[in-house]
Amino acid sequence: MADSVSLWLPAAVSVAGAVSGFAVWSRPVVLKVWVLAASLASFALLLMFPGAATGPSVVMLLPVAAFLSLLGQPAHEDNRAAWILTLLLLGLGLSLLAAHDGLGLILLALLLIVMVALLYRYRALSVSHLWQGIGMYGFGVVCAVVALTAPAPVSMVAVLAVCAILLPLAPLHGGYIAALAGLPGNLPAFLACLLPVLGLHTLTAALPRLPGDALGALPALGLVGAAYGALKALAQSRVRALLAYANLSFFSMLWWYVATVRTVPPQAVLYLAATGLATNGLLLSWYAIRARYGDMDLRAIRGLAHPMPRFAVLFALLILAALGLPPFGVFAGFMGLLLTPGLPLSGALAVIVLAWLAASWYLLDLLQRLLFGGHRPDLRYEDLRRTEFAALLAIVLILIVMGLAPTRVFQPGAPIAPAQVAGGLAWNR
């Protein structure tokens, strides 16, 4: 009971903070302070209550990612809706992690419905995969209903499809791409952490009960997704779409690993958490550019290293973290995956290495395009503001701590009751 309360209470605080935020809707500065306080309170409650995680588990990542994504936003009225939605999604995500029995699947369906509504509401901002994303999340709602009503093994295959939508795996990745490439404000940065965490949580719970045929097909899908995501990222000229496809490639590697070893060890959780947080930082960095100059094509802006030195240093560090270089968390997680005793590599290793080399190409190319080259005389350059700098610096420091911390502290689902991990969201009939 204490384990559930330790998540339900922070979830309730997040939702209450979102609802009460409408009382100060007309004052953006006050509203920003309010949502920051609500996300910080959720994090504090996870630490204070018995049954909460005592170490840097993946559950703790959610309020931290929400807080930092909110902190990096300017106090402008155009960002208010995204702030409120961040708290609502945080509350929904924590509720899903705490839920047992069929309630977990109901909350999953609710989350997917919210994603459909958000993509449709902000369809004018989307530049790619809008209807594919709406259709994919709608398909996820159908799968959640099937998982609630159908017998095994059909229900477990439906749950697996929902996992592949949240933790992106080709060919069910369209919703994730659309969310990161088309939603406003800090929402893409927060969702880059939230959706994969919920997907891995659901997969961890369902893994022992998945049909053998479905589980046997996942390693091949993971390798195909890693290669496909890398090739698509190479072809992108817009930053958010590039980062979304990069994440598809990185998370497909995680799918390959989990399906091969048929468990979710701490190094897999570390890899997911660090990858999501690095993407969070890169998306916040790009938002700082968009807030100044609009949603530009990569070819339209360059040469930021000299006029924006604080941005340049932090952006370069985040690129190195996302590439999996030491001492950042992605490196520790990725090396932990590859060095697992008894892991069959053979031909799969070649695909993983090629996908990682492709990541080195397109991420370093992104770094080179933005930071180096000639200045545009028609642009007024402005370096990071204090809140933007603080948010990005905190992300870099957390990634370093994740890389240096013992891997064992990243136990999957640390604050969740053991019975929930064994029985999943407990779709027992």
For every predicted segment, state its role:
Residues 1-429:
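Alpha-helical transmembrane segments of multi-pass membrane proteins predominantly involved
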